Regions:
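C-terminal domain-boundary segment and adjacent tail
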Residues: 215-309
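Surface-exposed, active-site-proximal loop segments in enzymatic domains
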Residues: 4-14, 82-94, 268-274
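Hydrophobic faces of well-ordered beta-strands that scaffold small-molecule active sites
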Residues: 40-42, 69-73, 120-122, 144-146, ...
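Active-site beta->alpha N-cap acidic-glycine motif
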Residues: 1-63, 289
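Acidic (Asp/Glu)-rich catalytic clusters
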Residues: 27-37, 50-78, 138, 243-253
Length: 309
């Protein structure tokens, strides 16, 4: 599963500058996906859902069944919230149920109007997911969410002022699962311990994940756990993709979910890609990852098709 949230080029910086220039970088990424028969899921925000260039570009791939288009809610760009939030990057989990449902309904309607499809896949902006959102997703026809980042605690990440930060996912599963009393499938981003203790959803994983961040946890991680995100970071290398693949195979995971922001695919639009050289490095690692996964027999599928199957 390849999940790509296309969005603003300047949202990594302070200010309210709105630019979708990084969307123009997506054809190169799409071409790489098609080279390895992988089907990306583009989870889009309100500003992308109403942009004519983005609609034309993504609709073409969607209509050819080479990509899926789903929803990605950023409260600070939602028409019903933008004036009140004034650029404050609150987590969707910090909204009331009424605020969240209105914002997601508007986004869903915009996608349906522009792309002539009803979106069924979703990710909360900034990983800001909570139980309140599950029933709303179901009411609006969504069948799959990918907002959970297992092993990660976002409570120290600032969202709403004078609030408690983001969600704590450390106790949640790595494998896909259904929320209780719900038909919405959760497909977490693949974050694995690839060291000595690599059993997925096992006792040691849960125990270590619950440890407070600090020097001791960093030492244990380096020696025994070696946590790896299925994302491209400046320090990523071929060995990371091999470790992730080996751990996934050993644990019989049904899926590996990778994600990248569209802003990380163009120069000067992300802290990870400040220069053209850094963009080329990202693409080298993407090529390495896709090649390793493809040679191992992994087959690409969109989020919603995975949920249906």
């Amino acid at each position: 599963l390849l999940v790509i949230p296309p969005g603003l080029s300047k949202e990594w910086k302070e200010g309210n500058i709105v630019s979708l220039s990084n969307i123009k970088s997506l054809p190169r990424f799409q071409e790489l996906c098609e080279k390895y028969n992988f089907i990306p899921t583009y989870l889009i925000t309100d500003e992308v859902a109403t942009d004519s260039f983005s609609i034309d570009l993504l609709s073409n791939w969607q209509d050819l069944k080479k990509a899926e288009v789903g929803s990605h809610l950023h409260p600070w760009t939602s028409p019903s919230l933008v004036d009140r939030l004034k650029g404050e990057h609150v987590f969707p989990s910090e909204l009331t149920r009424e605020e969240f449902k209105k914002a997601l309904t508007d986004l869903t309607d915009s996608i349906e109007s522009g792309f002539k499809i009803k979106p069924t896949s979703y990710r909360a902006g900034r990983w800001g997911f909570n139980n309140m959102q599950i029933k709303v997703l179901e009411e609006l026809g969504y069948i799959v969410d990918c907002s959970v980042s297992p092993k990660i605690d976002w409570r120290n990440t600032v969202g709403k002022k004078n609030s408690n930060g983001g969600p704590d996912f450390r106790g949640l599963k790595t494998r896909p699962y259904y929320f209780s009393d719900s038909k919405v499938l959760e497909v977490p981003i693949t974050i694995l311990y690839t060291g000595l203790f690599s059993k997925v959803d096992g006792y040691m994983e849960k125990l270590f994940s619950k440890m407070d961040d600090g020097f001791l946890k960093r030492v244990f991680n380096r020696l025994f756990f070696q946590m790896k995100w299925t994302r491209v970071f400046p320090e990523s290398s071929v060995s990371d993709w091999k470790r992730i693949l080996k751990t996934a195979q050993k644990n019989n995971l049904p899926v590996i979910e990778f994600m990248i922001h569209s802003s990380e695919l163009s120069s000067g639009t992300s802290p990870y890609t400040k220069t053209p050289e850094s963009v080329e490095r990202v693409y080298r690692e993407l090529e390495n990852m896709f090649r390793i996964f493809s040679e191992a027999g992994l087959v690409g599928i969109g989020l919603s098709d995975f949920a249906r199957n």
